[in-house]
Amino acid sequence: MSSGTLYDKVWDLHRVADLPGGSTQLFVGLHLIHEVTSPQAFAALQDKGLPVRCPERTVATVDHIVPTISQKRPFADPLAEEMLSTLERNCANYGIVLCGLGSGRQGIVHVIAPELGLTQPGMTVACGDSHTSTHGAFGAIAFGIGTSQVRDVLASQSLAMNKLKVRRIWVDGQLGSGVYAKDLILHVIRSLGVKAGVGYAYEFAGPAIDVLSMEERMTLCNMAIEGGARCGYVNPDGVTFDYLQGRFYAPTGEALHRAVAWWRSLASDPNAVFDDEVTFDAASIAPMVTWGITPGQGIAVDESVPTADSLEPSERPISEEACRYMDLEPGMAIEGVPVDVCFIGSCTNGRLSDLKAAAAIAKGRHVAQGIKAFVVPGSEQVARAAEAEGLDGVFRKAGFEWREPGCSMCLAMNPDRLEGRQISASSSNRNFKGRQGSSRGRTLLMSPAMVAAAAITGQVTDVRKLISNTVPSKSFHQ
């Protein structure tokens, strides 16, 4: 009887050769590229006169540097315009599909690949971006790579990799009202630490994971990297297969039936042996907010900033540093902390279900005075679907700005930036110093619904209080 994990099975299927020193040459089934980490890689190929080995397995988009208020060309930023033009030239020269602006398929790379059906169970997926682990939601092994490795994949369609250990994160029960996958992963990272996953792949499993939608699973896997794991994944199941059916690049007809049969066989076997296992109770998890300068510095919205005596000695220096930077006092409640900017979007939480959750809070309410709040769909497809359901109107009526797709304020590579000491409520994935533009800017990570609640009240607010006062509506057009 087979007794392997999904990670073991996918690794073995993609092994090309065992290399000196213990690493493995691993075939890459899908290579995703964007405008920031690909120019130098293409330049290296050109210097050596090398072709792209498998252009049909490479797909490009533009996301990091694009403005979200107006995407009219040429961009006001000449560097951003040059980066996009370079990507367009490279894709044309090497025969690579580019999901460009206005194509109907452009968006954040980790949003468009799943929605187009490019990401499928059993694949190895590589991209020059930290949050490539997103694609593990499909039962793929997906990892972020650096520019030199982007070059290697373009040239050889393979990478030299060291095999990881596998930690199973089992989650019992179900998440409560107002608690989302974002809260679950922030709770996991808080509990295990930002370095606990080093050398590991995280397998997310258990009753609470089984009932998550694909978009929620993507949020979960997206932030596995923030816990130190090289990748995170969920075993493929009926939820996965239903999501893929009808997607542009997904198999159809008899090919789909054969694919599903094979995809099912990839799941970790019941008697699979893991290197480590950790169990969580979903029902005990509350809406989360980060208070510090790492994603591991998170607390439930009804908790207080940790005091020194509640922390391990090794945690105290960075906690003190975080409090100084964030202008927070140990022991103070996180609920009620005022915010300046509220951002809903990113590869973590810029999908349709994320926008729906936030719109449900915004509907019939209005952004607090003095708060800048904006919504950035993760892709052109997400934007059009949201507009078809009337979500853009809900947000605009509530005082939010409705933007064009892109990475936006997740990182400081485009015009969407914090200024000075502004503090943001953000549905993105990193709260490092200066991450959102200003070298002195501050970031509070939370779910899209929590961001919407902060926008409405002007401060960190337990979204469950607003949910209890929300009248259910079947349509956002009402």
Swiss-Prot record:
It catalyses: (2R,3S)-3-isopropylmalate = (2S)-2-isopropylmalate. One of its GO terms (biological process) is L-leucine biosynthetic process. Binds 1 [4Fe-4S] cluster per subunit. Pathway: Amino-acid biosynthesis; L-leucine biosynthesis; L-leucine from 3-methyl-2-oxobutanoate: step 2/4. GO terms for molecular function: 3-isopropylmalate dehydratase activity; 4 iron, 4 sulfur cluster binding; metal ion binding. It comes from the Bacteria. Its EC number is 4.2.1.33. Transmembrane segments: none annotated. Keywords: 4Fe-4S, Amino-acid biosynthesis, Branched-chain amino acid biosynthesis, Iron, Iron-sulfur, Leucine biosynthesis, Lyase, Metal-binding. Its cofactor is [4Fe-4S] cluster. The keyword Glycoprotein does not apply. The keyword 4Fe-4S applies. [4Fe-4S] cluster binds at residues 347, 407, 410. Belongs to the aconitase/IPM isomerase family. LeuC type 1 subfamily. Catalyzes the isomerization between 2-isopropylmalate and 3-isopropylmalate, via the formation of 2-isopropylmaleate. Heterodimer of LeuC and LeuD. HAMAP family: LeuC_type1. This is 3-isopropylmalate dehydratase large subunit. It comes from Prochlorococcus marinus (strain MIT 9313).
